[in-house]
């Protein structure tokens, strides 16, 4: 009869499992920190690139922390994409009324031609700046 002692293998598996949980926890910390950094940078970019009129877009930037993921987004702000990417020329029509009217307009109109707007990116540049920091922090965790 041959008896094999597996106690060392069992210890190794337990250590590996503990290490895996520690790595997972460290990665989550890096993602959380970077998510909040990206959100803060994006808010700063909005202020710096002249996109602020009411502050609604800046206040709408939120960071959601999940399990091994972080999402930085603009919550329920329909025009955020237009600010980030710009818009093509388009026609604006009255939806709920018969005509459009604004202060200093000579008379109401059924539609107006908008020339489009240049992109004023705020979210992508914030991510691009933080990307290198994320990668360096993750490399430190993996190199144990």
Residue ranges: model-predicted function:
Residues 79-85:
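Short, cysteine-centered beta-strand-loop-beta hairpins and adjacent loop/turn segments enriched
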Residues 89-90:
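Short, His- and charge-rich active-site/binding loops that engage polyanionic ligands
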Residues 1-78, 93-144:
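Short, Lys/Arg-rich flexible segments
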């Amino acid at each position: 009869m041959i008896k094999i002692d597996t106690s060392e293998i069992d210890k190794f598996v337990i250590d590996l499992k503990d290490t895996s949980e520690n790595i997972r926890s460290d990665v989550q910390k890096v993602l959380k920190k970077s998510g909040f950094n990206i959100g803060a940078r994006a808010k700063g970019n909005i202020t710096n690139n002249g996109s602020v009129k009411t502050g609604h877009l800046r206040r709408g930037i939120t960071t959601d922390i999940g399990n091994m993921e972080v999402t930085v987004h603009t919550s329920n702000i329909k025009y955020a994409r237009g600010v980030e990417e710009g818009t093509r020329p388009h026609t604006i029509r009255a939806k709920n009324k018969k005509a459009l009217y604004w202060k200093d307009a000579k008379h109401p109109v059924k539609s107006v031609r908008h020339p489009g707007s240049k992109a004023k990116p705020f979210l992508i540049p914030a991510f691009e700046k933080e990307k290198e920091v994320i990668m360096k922090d993750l490399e430190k965790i993996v190199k144990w």
